């Protein structure tokens, strides 16, 4: 068991404190006196000591100087945001962008599905309805409304033709009468009379299908030819007193004559060539269709055993004379029992 510690009394404590204070005061005064005397005798030693003291001990800064780094650090910390906050903001922006794109894709898919449904419904309705029946129904409705209007006007004591003429101009009425007259003449002219009349009908039909002359293209080509001839010196452009421009052919090669061959140098455009090809294909299809109909009417829609019309006639002649002898052989070939 260790011995008990001795406790100091209050007077002893006070005496010890005063003794320590006196020792500290003496220690502070003695170095000062010593430094003064030593400075007079050894200035180089004191300078070295001061240099070492200044290099070893940190510099003492004032309150303003110590406050400046703190403010700079505070401003730097406030000016540069934390990396975690910027990363979170960028992630949120990307998430919003992805959500907007997803909503746009959803809206686009919804609109496309609705449009597809509408088009499919219209297509099914079109397939279910017969166009010929719709045309016939519209024609019947127009005839019925015409007859009903005519009966109402006649019952009221009016003139139906005069009443109907109020809705049309004179030019429209004349065009309609001309059209009806032409239609009646065409109806009476449908029967075949001779090949010249048939060729004329085909020629007129082809002219109607051409769609009329291209006057704009003709004007462009004409101006280009005039400019080319004027540049070559074979054509002279003269202006009259009235301001009219006249082209004078110097050597007689610009304007076409009976001996000119400029028409052979014409090159049609691609649209005209395509129209010609389509017209030829249409004529060929019509010819094949009539040929099939003619063969069906003559009973020749079975197996084709000929290569041309002459060979067909020869096969028919053989059939007339030898079918009664070869019928059994042909039937055996068809059954597959022929040895």
From Swiss-Prot:
InterPro entries recorded: mRNA_splic_SYF2
Keywords, sorted A to Z: mRNA processing, mRNA splicing, Nucleus, Spliceosome
Polar residues biased stretches: 17-37, 126-135
GO biological process: mRNA processing; RNA splicing
Lineage top rank: taxon: Eukaryota
Biased composition (Basic and acidic residues): 7-16, 94-103
A single cellular component GO annotation: Prp19 complex
Predominant place of localization: nucleus
Pfam family, any one: SYF2
Location of the protein in the cell: Nucleus
Residue ranges, annotated region (Disordered): 1-136
Assembly information from the UniProt record: Associated with the spliceosome.
Record PANTHER family: GCIP-INTERACTING PROTEIN P29 (PTHR13264), PRE-MRNA-SPLICING FACTOR SYF2 (PTHR13264:SF5)
Function of the protein: Involved in pre-mRNA splicing.
Family designation: Belongs to the SYF2 family.
Name this protein carries in UniProt: Pre-mRNA-splicing factor syf2
Organism, scientific name: Neurospora crassa (strain ATCC 24698 / 74-OR23-1A / CBS 708.71 / DSM 1257 / FGSC 987)
């Amino acid at each position: 068991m260790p011995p008990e510690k001795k406790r100091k009394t209050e007077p002893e404590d006070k005496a010890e404190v005063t003794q320590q204070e006196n020792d500290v005061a003496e220690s502070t005064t003695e170095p000062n006196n010593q430094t003064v005397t030593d400075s007079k005798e050894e200035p180089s030693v004191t300078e070295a000591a001061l240099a070492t003291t200044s290099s070893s001990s940190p510099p003492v800064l004032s309150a303003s100087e110590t406050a400046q780094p703190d403010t700079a650090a505070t401003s730097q910390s406030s000016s540069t945001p934390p990396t975690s906050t910027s990363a979170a903001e960028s992630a949120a922006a990307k998430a919003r962008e992805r959500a907007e794109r997803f909503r746009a894709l959803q809206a686009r898919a919804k609109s496309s599905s609705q449009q597809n449904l509408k088009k499919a419904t219209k297509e099914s309705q079109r397939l279910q309805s017969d166009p010929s029946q719709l045309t016939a129904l519209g024609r019947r409705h127009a005839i019925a409304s015409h007859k009903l209007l005519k009966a109402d006007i006649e019952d009221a004591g009016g003139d139906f033709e005069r009443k109907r003429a109020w809705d049309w101009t004179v030019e429209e009425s004349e065009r309609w009468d001309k059209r009806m007259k032409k239609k009646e003449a065409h109806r009476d002219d449908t029967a075949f009379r001779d090949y010249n009349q048939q060729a004329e009908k085909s020629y007129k039909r082809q002219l109607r299908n051409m769609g009329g002359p291209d006057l704009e293209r003709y004007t462009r080509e004409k101006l280009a030819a005039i400019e080319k001839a004027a540049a070559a010196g074979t054509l002279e452009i003269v202006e009259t007193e009235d301001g009219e421009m006249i082209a004078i052919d110097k050597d007689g090669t610009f304007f076409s004559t009976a001996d000119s061959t400029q028409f052979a140098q014409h090159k049609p455009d691609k649209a005209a060539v395509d129209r010609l090809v389509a017209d030829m294909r249409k004529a060929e299809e019509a010819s094949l269709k009539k040929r099939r109909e003619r063969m069906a009417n003559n009973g020749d829609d079975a197996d084709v055993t000929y290569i041309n019309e002459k060979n067909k006639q020869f096969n028919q002649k053989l059939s007339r004379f030898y079918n009664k002898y070869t019928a059994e052989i042909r039937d055996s070939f068809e059954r597959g029992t022929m040895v």
